[in-house]
């Protein structure tokens, strides 16, 4: 199937938003994706979620219309789905209340990443508190921050973590550390350990010249107020609530294309967990 890449911005986005069909065209699968979300999605359409979107289109007998937004992925619902630039997002948390979600097509979780020669042992989040492991890389706005706070490592690590965004001012803007940077810091010895969502890290762990070890975290965090922070997540395809007629065909495509999707996840090196 052909992929129609469209860079959406400014007046072009507004014009597209006005063209809102009553029913989604099932021969043209409109999927929003970010140009800034590698390894999930990138401007070249080489992210593993971009590849899964192509599988869905193929299985549906549709043309993939991959609508690339030059925004961070957290804005895809607001600036893509809600503006009717697209109907589908690949790789959302199962049960995301902003969308209709399919049955999960994979499950994974947060992980520790270390150099193999560091001989790190442990699969509980509390295990970051080990002698000789003092510097931690992670993506902002993630459970990694809670883990470091609860183990007393957060404040000590602040200056190093800020250096990963070149000390960029985080006020009134969304700032993030690239997933690739989180892993290269470990490989190069800048960080002793990374705490990262495994699908974000797998490609870079796989391709690292320095042998790395990725270990899934097996327990969840219970905050001091009793709230549970899960560290394992099921991933689904999200569909706009204005186009529920797409949900069934996408569910069927996930089933008929399961072998191809599993092969993509395996090639990516993502550690998979049994469906919950």
Swiss-Prot record:
Keywords, ordered alphabetically: Methanol utilization, Periplasm, Signal
Domain of life: Bacteria
InterPro entries, per database record: Methanol_oxidation_MoxJ, Solute-binding_3/MltF_N
GO biological process: methanol catabolic process
GO cellular component: periplasmic space
CDD domains recorded: PBP2_MxaJ
Protein name, entry field: Protein MoxJ
Gene designation per UniProt: moxJ
